[in-house]
Amino acid sequence: MVESADGNTLYVAAYEFFVSIDVSDKDNPIQNYSVGTGGLYSWDIVLSSDEQTAFLASGSYVKIYDISDPLQAVLITDFVSSGDNDDDGTTDGTARSLRISADGNTLYVANGGEGTRIIDISDVSSPQLMGYVTSDNFVFGLAMSADGTMIYSSSSGELQTINVTDPQNPELIRAIPSVRDSWRL
């Protein structure tokens, strides 16, 4: 869930939906819209800095929506965030957690069994995979350093520190075993 900068709208990744709620009257929240995800679970949502675009982690996709109309979200594109690495005919990753760079041009995706994906979103209608860091475990959560140079990923067995100063060539700085499954950072 993410709140608009003015505090009047909540955007929610809700089970198999993406929901916008007007909370300008805190005693009487009103649903603006609800968009189905085609049966895919929605795990996380982030907004562009101008709050005109929403990025939704949903199944093996990052769904990108134009949210400039407060009463309607329009799907711009579905970016397949994963591939078929084992050639079994199915996608291997599951987009779970998202972070966006301060300049709004790069999206970081905790992508389940495929590790951490780095996506160029400078053109939201045509996102491109820039780089990635694999993991032997299922990556659930992401956090970003205050200066935007490091991504921290959590998985079902380790915590990773990734230098993303050059997003096309991310560098795994450290991986340490986690005591328990760390779902979110």
Regions found by a protein language model. Give the residues of each.
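Feature marking well-ordered beta-strand scaffolds used for ligand recognition
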Residues: 1-185
